[in-house]
């Protein structure tokens, strides 16, 4: 019985090597999840993205499903290559809608949950940078939560929302819906997520 000799083109071999190398690099740095015009990453740790879907419109928001492993603030990195301005009336582009669905895997109850937008990491986002939870617009019925009954929003000297009047025990879920607008779009910005435990 004769064995057939297989000759693989060098380009095919090189392509396979690069493909598997890219997979390994992505696994090491943290997976990028895509939805709408954006990618989302948990590469800074403290939580894990389980899934992402949606386009970012009000009717079809970007739904981000996460599990939190601790009670320390975590950073979601949001990136886009499409920074061209669009009309906010189109309900997509520089204005998009998100729903964050979280599971408490920290082992501690959460009595509040905060979100803060930052254009530069660890630098408060003020009015001048154009990034906000749609600060100048009508947010009626655009911000809601399952798990907390109320929220407060602070726009200066930072863009922050804190959801209150509820408790998410270990193993339980909560969800938060809100718009994000960036009128001076950048390729990368950050969403700080802050589960809060009882003070005593």
Language-model regions: role of each:
Residues 100-102:
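Buried hydrophobic-core signal for structured, non-transmembrane domains
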Residues 108-112:
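Short acidic/proline- and small/hydrophobic-mixed sequence motifs that coincide with surface turns
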Residues 126, 131-137:
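Cysteine-centric segments in proteins
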Residues 26-97, 107, 118-128, 148-200:
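Membrane engagement elements in two modes
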Residues 2-13:
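Bacterial N-terminal signal peptides that target proteins for export
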């Amino acid at each position: 019985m004769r064995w057939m000799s297989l000759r693989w083109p060098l380009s095919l071999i090189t392509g396979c090597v690069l493909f598997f190398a890219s997979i390994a690099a992505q696994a090491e740095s943290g997976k990028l999840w895509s939805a709408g015009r954006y990618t989302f990453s948990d590469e800074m740790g403290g939580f894990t993205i389980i899934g992402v879907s949606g386009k970012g419109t009000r009717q079809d928001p970007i739904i981000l499903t996460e599990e939190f492993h601790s009670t320390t603030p975590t950073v979601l990195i949001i990136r886009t290559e499409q920074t061209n301005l669009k009309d906010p009336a189109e309900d997509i582009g520089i204005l998009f809608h998100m729903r964050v669905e979280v599971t408490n895997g920290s082992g501690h109850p959460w009595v509040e949950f905060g979100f803060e937008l930052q254009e530069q990491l660890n630098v408060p986002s003020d009015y001048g940078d154009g990034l906000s939870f749609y600060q100048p617009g009508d947010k009626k019925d655009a911000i809601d939560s399952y798990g907390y009954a109320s929220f407060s929003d602070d726009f200066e000297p930072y863009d922050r929302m804190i959801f209150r009047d509820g408790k998410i025990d270990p193993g339980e879920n909560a969800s938060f819906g809100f718009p994000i607008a960036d009128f001076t779009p950048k390729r990368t910005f950050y969403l700080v997520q802050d589960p809060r435990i009882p003070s005593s």
